[in-house]
Swiss-Prot record:
The gene is ATP6V0E2. It is found in: Membrane; Cytoplasmic vesicle, Clathrin-coated vesicle membrane; Cytoplasmic vesicle, Secretory vesicle, Synaptic vesicle membrane. This is V-type proton ATPase subunit e 2. Subunit of the V0 complex of vacuolar(H+)-ATPase (V-ATPase), a multisubunit enzyme composed of a peripheral complex (V1) that hydrolyzes ATP and a membrane integral complex (V0) that translocates protons. V-ATPase is responsible for acidifying and maintaining the pH of intracellular compartments and in some cell types, is targeted to the plasma membrane, where it is responsible for acidifying the extracellular environment. GO terms for biological process: proton transmembrane transport; regulation of macroautophagy; transmembrane transport; vacuolar acidification. InterPro entries: ATPase_V0-cplx_e1/e2_su, ATPase_V0-cplx_e1/e2_su_met. GO terms for molecular function: ATPase-coupled ion transmembrane transporter activity; proton-transporting ATPase activity, rotational mechanism. Signal peptide: none annotated. Belongs to the V-ATPase e1/e2 subunit family. Residues 1-7, 57-81 are lumenal. Isoform 1 is expressed at high levels in heart, brain and kidney and also detected in inner ear epithelium, vestibule, testis, epididymis and bladder. Isoform 2 is expressed in heart, kidney, placenta and pancreas. Isoform 2 is not detected in frontal cortex, but is prevalent in all other brain areas.
Length: 81
């Protein structure tokens, strides 16, 4: 994965969830539950962004690769040729 193809989604998703968490509370109507709704919006933005970030970083540098037996590797190679 090149630096450009990784940086663009990170910038886009960071901007999106930043807008949801920062600009979203400005559009909540006044009422008795306004504080609860704002808290829910900010918590949702933070949780969704962290979930996405952890998932994309785990795919970027995995801790271990697929565990294949030699017979499986030879069979796959035979089928692909």
């Amino acid at each position: 994965m090149t630096a450009h193809s990784f940086a663009l989604p990170v910038i886009i998703f960071t901007t999106f969830w930043g807008l949801v968490g920062i600009a979203g509370p400005w559009f909540v109507p006044k009422g008795p539950n306004r504080g609860v709704i704002i808290t829910m919006l900010v918590a949702t933005a933070v949780c969704c962004y962290l979930f996405w970030l952890i998932a994309i970083l785990a795919q970027l540098n995995p801790l271990f690769g697929p565990q294949l037996k030699n017979e499986t590797i030879w069979y796959v190679r035979f089928l692909w040729e």
